[in-house]
From Swiss-Prot:
InterPro entries: Cell_div_FtsZ, Cell_div_FtsZ_CS, FtsZ/CetZ, FtsZ_C, Tub_FtsZ_C, Tubulin/FtsZ-like_C, Tubulin/FtsZ_2-layer-sand-dom, Tubulin/FtsZ_GTPase_sf. The keyword Cell division applies. Belongs to the FtsZ family. This is Cell division protein FtsZ.
């Protein structure tokens, strides 16, 4: 295990006057719009939300403050009919509107469910606009469940290839992979809801590191250095319970990711979030970070966050986003932990959130890390917070 040092900082709430970074999230199509709605419902703050759709009726039901009706001339507000070429034409029709709404952003997240008409066709157009504006652009998209048919999967892959050309970083979550982390009682409705939740988690986990200000600050430049021009990214979720919880959580996060064809080995940038109970120790954090970073590039930059959730008993959750791979086809991590499949209840816990998420950044140098970190504490009782994990006592109110 590689050693590293930590420098703690004092807790401080977000202050918009000292963190001027402008983040925007745009959901394209039905899946993207649903994901944006979930983010708003979960209380993701200090982010501007936009939805863009060809289906006017669906657009009107969105709770996003900014709604873009795409392609009135092309679709008459009736949707793209599952045809990406229609979604693309609709976005191109209103490209000036898209540009106006993205203008001024430092970072844009584009979220969509790939395989349909609007999201698949419009997302690459939106990404190209953001690229032309010089905005750091991250795509967070899903691929269809297998039961949705081979045609939809083929369309999704074509759309992803188009999107990849314009985004800096692309996180692709195959919905089918969700079936490996839930139990057999999961309903179809819940499956799609959880797909939306994973999109939300990917966006707010990254955004939270930027918008939450600490005394020793992780600024936009830190995250930009990890995300800019990095291509496909890995997103993994791990869980551990009992005596070996730290090892199990860390290892399962990097060996059972919700992502195809990408492994953590050789990555040059990491975003890591760890959540444990009141008994979560510094040594466990060190153990987790050591397991996760042992296979990354020697010059890797690691931005981490850890949360204390008093409702967790003897449990640890780990989420990892990794970027900067030399190849998409990396050798799999050989060790496989026990109990690395989440139950439906555990996955619901992971999809919730947490109100205490201190974060930090490491620069790996030989066998040690030079660290700068920030701690964040949230005190808002009325809305949820922009971190991976929300307090469990709010879970019941969302179901």
């Amino acid at each position: 295990m590689k050693d590293y040092n930590m420098i703690d900082s004092h807790t401080r709430r977000f202050d918009s006057t000292t963190n001027p970074t402008i983040l925007k999230v745009i959901g394209a199509g039905g899946g993207g719009s649903n994901a944006v709605n979930r983010m708003i419902e979960y209380g993701v703050r200090d982010v501007e939300f936009i939805v863009a759709n060809t289906d006017l009726q669906a657009l009107q039901t969105s709770i996003a403050p900014i709604k873009i009706a795409l392609g009135a001339k092309v679709t008459a507000g009736l949707g793209a009919g599952g045809k990406p070429e229609i979604g693309q034409a609709a976005a191109e029709e209103d490209i000036d509107v898209i540009r106006n709404h993205l203008s001024g952003a430092d970072m844009v997240f584009i979220t969509a469910g790939m395989g349909g008409g609007t999201g698949t066709g419009a997302a690459p157009v939106i990404a190209q606009v953001a690229k032309e504006l010089g905005i750091l652009t991250v795509g967070v998209v899903t691929k269809p469940f297998k039961f949705e048919g081979p045609k939809k999967l083929r369309l999704a892959e074509q759309g992803i290839n188009n999107l990849r050309k314009s985004v800096d970083t692309l996180i692709i979550i195959p919905n089918q992979k969700l079936l490996t982390v839930v139990d057999k009682r999961t309903t179809i409705k819940d499956a799609f809801k959880r797909a939306d939740d994973v999109l939300r988690m990917g966006v707010q986990g990254i955004a939270g590191l930027i918008i939450e200000h600490g005394e020793v600050n992780i600024d936009f430049a830190d995250v930009k250095s990890i995300m800019q021009g990095q291509g496909d990214a890995l997103m993994g979720i791990g869980y551990g319970k009992g005596e070996n919880r730290a090892v199990d959580a860390a290892t399962s996060a990097i060996s059972n990711p919700l992502l195809e064809e990408v492994r953590i080995e050789g990555s040059k940038g990491l975003l890591v979030n760890v959540t444990g109970g009141d008994d979560f120790s510094l040594l466990e954090l060190e153990e987790i970070m050591g397991i996760i970073t042992v296979s990354v590039d020697d010059e890797a930059t690691v931005i981490y966050g850890h949360a204390i959730n008093s409702n967790l008993e003897d449990e640890i959750y780990v989420t990892v986003v990794a970027t900067g791979f030399a190849s998409k086809k990396q050798k799999e991590i050989s060790s496989t932990p026990e109990n690395n499949t989440l139950s439906s209840k555990e996955f619901d816990t992971l999809m919730s959130g947490n109100q205490n998420a201190p974060s930090g950044s490491y620069e790996q140098q030989d066998s040690s890390f030079a660290a700068k970190s920030k701690n964040v504490n949230y005190f808002d009782d009325d809305i949820d917070v922009p971190t991976f994990l929300r307090n469990l006592n709010k879970k019941s109110s969302d179901d």
